[in-house]
Swiss-Prot record:
NCBIfam families, per database record: GTPase_EngA (TIGR03594), small_GTP (TIGR00231)
Record text on subunit structure and interactions: Associates with the 50S ribosomal subunit.
Protein name, as recorded: GTPase Der
Disulphide bridges, residue numbers: none
HAMAP family: GTPase_Der
Amino acid sequence: MSFKPVVALVGRPNVGKSTLFNRLTRSRAALVADYSGLTRDRHYGEGRVGDTPFIVIDTGGFEPVAKTGILREMARQTRQAIAEADVVVFLVDARAGVNAHDHEIAQLLRKSGQQRVVLAVNKAEGMGVGNATSEFHELGLGTPYPISAAHGDGIVDLIGLALQDLVEPEPEPAPDAADLPPDHRIKLAIVGRPNVGKSTLINTLLGEERVIAFDLPGTTRDAIEIDFERDGRKYTLIDTAGLRRRGKVFEAVEKFSVIKTLQAIEASNVVLLMLDAQTEVSEQDAHIAGFVLETGRAVVVAINKWDGLDIDQRERIEREFRRKLRFLSFAPTHTISALKGQGIKPVLKSVVAAHAAAFAKLSTPKLTRELHAAVEQQPPPRKGIFRPKMRYAHQGGQNPPLVIIHGNALDAIPDSYRRYLETRFREAFKLDGTPLRIEFKSSRNPYTQES
């Protein structure tokens, strides 16, 4: 199995990195826009241009606010992302021209060892190609390509060039839950920021015998997959760059890589998100959790180092979790001590349940009955003089489950009512641990019909 390619957007502030990021990822972001509490300031996302899927990172999210030199502003994670990405898109500003910061970043890129850098000259709309790009040749990074992130000009060609020879055919769709054999392995990614205890938990899961290492993958874009078994259930651990080889076995070490984390999330069936009970829920925690939600992966939360807290501290971390990660309210949450091996069995039980929920089959008759019962108890609000009418529902996909609702005047269903229906479907089908997406399809334009 190979990971999706990763595109890192690099450039000084205000050259349009966020605009390009939003254009590349907007179709995916729209799927989860209604989740309460989900940060709008996204740094990681799933992108697609035509039939080409990829992961995109806006490295601007890693830059401190400090007004020091541009190289000092670029955090360690930015430099790591530059080195580990499959391709770097270096954005410059056609209207501002080349400046000293651009030269410093170009020098950093040359020293990084990154072999694939595409120079994108943004804000080139209304300018001739020569006028927009000529002076950027002096950066020494090859041909500059004019684009307009705001208007979408040149984006398809830019990404096609960036991902040339990197794109592989998309994998076959995952099988239905009913078609999965009893010994089907759950692909599990354990993610979390540095020093949260991932390595301790992984070593506990792998057990005293460890696991025999087969041939290591040949390239960094291949996933390292480690099979293990607990309580008769088979799992495949997808590495997040925290495993090292010792002889013929792998041992987990505490290491963090944004790119490897995002790729492992993409490749998994279930994500185990680890938080540190002894530190605050960070922006990075929230961004990683948001990416999990965007990809539609089932998720279980484990709050580690719980054993060292008093009652007041435990109440504080629970309040903070509910406030900062309330968009993960569907995810089972456990408190554990990875070091002492406490609370691990319930976590894995939730992983199994979340996996089953992600691949659950939802029958059309039961979905429709539950829909009608929900509408009878709480009808959807009117849009002007029109009352939405929901006729029937059916399943449109799995991993995550997608429910498609058909009817009239459904174009303006508010997010609050969507969440109400989600709650009803979750309770009816026991869909704990998986995102649930709802799509409305109107049979006719509600503004051309009588109420």
